[in-house]
Amino acid sequence: MESARLVGDYALGPRIGSGSFAVVWLAKHRSSGLEVAVKEIDKKLLSPKVRDNLLKEISILSTIDHPNIIRFYEAIETGDRIFLVLEYCSGGDLAGYINRHGKVPEAVAKHFMRQLALGLQVLQEKHFIHRDLKPQNLLLSSKEVTPLLKIGDFGFARSLTPESMAETFCGSPLYMAPEIIRNQKYDAKADLWSAGAILFQLVTGKPPFDGNNHIQLFHNIVRDTELKFPEDTRNEIHPDCVDLCRSLLRRNPIERLTFREFFNHMFLREPRQIPDVEHSGFSTCTGKSLLPSAQPSTSTNRFKSSAENVHKHGSSSSASNSQISMPHTSFEKTRKDTEGQCSSNQSGVVDSLELIEREYVLVNRPSASLEGSSDCFDTSLQDSGFPNILPRNEKVSSSSLEAQKPLSDVSGPRPASVSYLLTEVQRLTIVHPPTKLQLLHQYAQALTELASEMGNTGQVKESFAVTLVVLAVWRKALEICDSWMMSVGENEVNPDPTTAPETSIPDLNSPAPAKTWVTQEFVTALNQAENLSTQLNETSAATHMPDAMETIYERALAYGKSGGAEEYLSNKESAATLYKKAILLLSFIIEEAVTLSLNPSFSLTPDDKKRILYYISNLQHRRSHL
């Protein structure tokens, strides 16, 4: 009997796939017996472009360790071959699954889309776009009804900073975004279009667009008509699913859902549990990730760099130079310090607001309905100077929110209502850039005031760290202006940076004046950062820099505590102002900070998000009853 072919430590078995440039083999590790997929690539078939794509795939996969991304073990190079050793998925791909099952139940579609969203979240955090998302590239861990889904085949993927736009024509025609077909510049939202096409196919059994040939297919994708669901499925599909499909398959990428909105869409949400004040995990110290020590979700458990994994050549993605570099603390040290404090006295930054709630906020609190929380949140936005994001004649009805109530007899404010409303804010602002710009202005204004307070009290390093976040906020606003101008076809505006900033928000009915105003605000923040940097240099403050997000979080807690004290002393106006500041900063952390281009990147664990939503809900509840 002929012995198995050996590649490194792996014995190759049967062929399980093939393509234009590669053959895929099922293989086993000779020592551990681990089954893997080995992609064999003939170097002679590689053009320089294809070789570059291959190196990108190695580079991307070597930096990611996530259950919804295909796992990369190593690359082995011989004289005429390159072998990629990858995780083996016995369930085949999603295309085969759809061929076997046809349209799937909505629960199964929801399962797969949640898995896809989790994988895309990792790519988005790393500023990668896949560019070829399709059922054939979504692998399944087993042949179960609801297996684990993993994103694979990164040959077309590329690193993309939030400001940059790709121009390469690539991807599968059935799942290709209109902006790619039109040969326009595109960004990571092209992946969201593909995700929408995949969801549509899951729940209907067929892609959203077809044609007799590529020309007809492309015409059907780019023409401005409403997405149509097959007659036999219209009454079967939940409105949330229909909304997600339509929101992802918007031809104008500006109107398409953002990644944040996609991850938080109602269709993908898990059933929520209402925290119990006395028995919630928030009120105990478990030693798990807490906000000050929360690490970016992709910063730990990574595989070795490609320089270590590729035997003869390495490849690694260069860090983006477009990010705002943030001074930061040692997360590991902070985590240990925090854990050491928790077990004894429940003190420290993380638990301080919890103690505030017990002392000031949660005393004899009356029951609050979701509708009440909705009104409270809307009122807070108006009081803060926000635009009327939920107009009175379009306010979400109590009946539509009724489905969000897990329990009708639970007293106290509900975090679910705040999360729902914040998501509605995000969903509406994508269609209205002026509203989003004003929201960013509110965050920038609050952070600028915080930086000023700290600078006035001699906390120059903290002030500098927060000012860098302000710069990141205005940079995002500039990106929105650029995209807005592109969508309406306005010419580029190059405002004079020496022009004095506007003292108030201008009329934002068109992108040109909006960009002028945003640029002026950015320059103002940049000048402030330079002044603070000069102060630091003059004082030789080359010491450890504080973490900006911890600083913002701590100050939000302090505002909440002070507001509770003022409420206790019946100083209602002062209490309302302090509560409002705390709510705004906490809302910034949970809704906007995680989307900014910061270095190091900032992320929250699910527990952190729930905790902060709970704080926001309680603070809103107290403020509404002053």
From Swiss-Prot:
Active site (UniProt): D132
Gene3D superfamilies named in the record: Transferase(Phosphotransferase) domain 1
Posttranslational mods: Phosphorylated during nutrient starvation. Dephosphorylated in nutrient-rich conditions.
SUPFAM superfamilies membership: Protein kinase-like (PK-like)
Composition bias, Basic and acidic residues: 330-339
GO molecular function: ATP binding; protein serine/threonine kinase activity
Domain Protein kinase: 10-268
EC number annotated for this UniProt entry: 2.7.11.-
Signal peptide: none
Compositional bias annotation for Low complexity: 315-325
Subcellular location(s) of the protein: Cytoplasmic vesicle, Autophagosome
GO cellular component term, pick one: autophagosome
Chain positions of motif AIM (Atg8-family-interacting motif): 360-363
Entry similarity comment: Belongs to the protein kinase superfamily. Ser/Thr protein kinase family.
Purpose of the protein: Serine/threonine protein kinase involved in autophagy in a nutritional condition-dependent manner. The ATG1-ATG13 protein kinase complex regulates downstream events required for autophagosome enclosure and/or vacuolar delivery. Becomes a target of autophagy under nutrient starvation. Connects autophagy to plant nutritional status.
Name this polypeptide is given: Serine/threonine-protein kinase ATG1a
Species of the source: Arabidopsis thaliana (Mouse-ear cress)
